[in-house]
């Protein structure tokens, strides 16, 4: 599938997640094997095989989830786009969303359009540093 913009690819990514469709999910990912995925509290997964296996397990267990994406920040040039956002996740049977997940999604442009090369998702810290002002960690 050809995605004309990084936003198109990202929309398809979250739609595939919501409907639990592995074929649609993997259509978003680059066909190259130099792709990486890090799920919350998970190890670094490299390559289509490892990433597809992880998504197959997640999608089988996540039917009916819904996302609201907020505070999207985007950095784009001609060949690479990085989007940082909050994933607000609603699970069937629960009355309120789960605590937000902070996600970084990177997309690379090629003749076949924009495709995901990185998805890194982490739980938001209880004491979100964005609410405290700048902190120095290095």
Q: Model-flagged regions — what are they?
A:
Residues 1-27, 34-138:
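A beta-strand edge to alpha-helix "cap/lid" segment located at domain peripheries
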